[in-house]
Every structure is written in C-alpha cells, then in structure tokens.
Amino acid sequence: MASFLNQFTRQPKIFGTLPSQGITYNQEVIQDMNVTSVPIFGMNTMDELILKTPDALFSGEATALVVKSCIPSILDPWKILTADMDYLLIGVRIATYGDRLPITTTCPKCKADTKSDLHLPSLLDNYTSQEPVEKITFNGLDLDIVPLTYEISTKISKDNYQMQRTLLHIDQQKDLSEEQKDLQKQTIYKSLSMLNFETVLHHVYSISDGQNVETDKEEIFAFVKNSEIGLYKLIEDATNIISKKFALPKVDVACSSETCNHVYKSETSFDYSNFFEVRS
C-alpha cells in the first residue's frame, strides 16, 4: 500500500519555455521534445548539499545533477544550450525561493553599497524574447550559429582555468631562467589561442548549401580551418551577438545613501556557487 506521504511530494512550481526552442535537441535530451511547457520543481535537501560541494561545482556535475532532479524532463543536462541552462537555473531558483533575488551593488558616484532585489521572472522573459539562432551566409553556404552546450562550456572553462594556473606556476618557478619561462609560456599561449579558436567554432550548429546539411563537428571544424579567414570572422561576430543577446541585462539601482540618491545601472551576474543560497 502506498504511503499517504506520496501526496505531499514535490510538485512543479512553474512551467518554462526554453529560449532555444529546442533547435539542437532530440528526445534523448528532453522528454517528448516538450520545450514550451517544461515543469520546474523546487530543490530538495540533497540538491542543496550537492551545490555546496566545491569539486562538483567546478566540474559542472553539481549543476547537471540539480537540473535532473528539479527538471526531470531534461534527460541529458550536458547537451542543454547555455542560454537554456541559465534560464532553467533561474527557474529552479524561483521555484525554490521565490521571485526575487537579493543583490548588493556599489554606487559609482559615492561608493556606498545598496541592497536591492532582482526580479527574476523579468529575466526569464528577457531570455525567451531573444532569437536563439544567428544565421550567416558565406560563398553560398548558410550557417546556423547557436549558444554552446553546457558540456562544451564547462570543458572550456576548466581548460582555461588549468592553463591560467599553469602560467602562474611557471612565473613562480625560481629554478627557471626568464628565457625558459618565456618558452614554456609561449606553449601555453598557443594552447589558449587554439582554445579560443575552437570555442568560436563550437557555436556552429550546421552548414547548408541549400540541399545538404552538415552537423558533424569534425567536418565543420576542418572546413572552417581550411577556409578563408573571412568565414571565421563572420562566425566570431555572430557568436558575439549571441553572447550579448543572452547576457544578463543591467538593472537600474537608486543609491541608498541619503546624501547621494544617484540612480545608476549595475551589471548582474550569477555565480552558481552562491546563486542558490537563501539571502535576506
């Protein structure tokens, strides 16, 4: 006999519409390809504990586990585009703690700190109002440029972090000459340049000539690498447009200092290590 407690288990608090419209997904990524009414649950105790594990946060595993717990229709969080991931995590925050996120900003005029609330549903609206694909044309080819997947974004962040750490380690080596340090750092700089190059190319979802469509990453990478530099520049410009479209908007803040009252715009950003903390 089922326990009466089952009727008190978590229920969806909100239903979301994915900004990407599921353009790159299949049924292995999201159940039934439902991208317009995605049920989002609040976090449970285990979710909160996972988000307090530094190694799991750094690897991206904590976020992936929380998404699978709070949004069970997402079957493979690693394949979710970053624009959708940010949207979903904001949704989880709303479902868990409510519509508002307390923030503290610094007045650029008097340097006083001001506490205010960020209205999270308006951020969700901002995400869904954006076109998820940038289309470019080059020599008769049509390219679809989309946000990175969470998997690729996480890998790039980890690789970049490790390379920056290596550069710092080289500088701290007292047994190396300046020439030896420069040689080692040049190797890292080349790797960073290649990482930046590949980051741009990972935004290319497909290339079409009107009759055929190529989505294989290896084929796309090889083609762009062997094409005129103009193609790469077009892709890079399109990725910058996407980044700006899905960046968190600046918020208007009135300085709390009675002698100032300056109204300023403040940038917002989310650090997922503390985004889900309860703040008063």
Question: For each of these PLM feature ranges, what is it?
Answer:
Residues 1-280:
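Long C-terminal interaction/binding lobes of large macromolecular proteins
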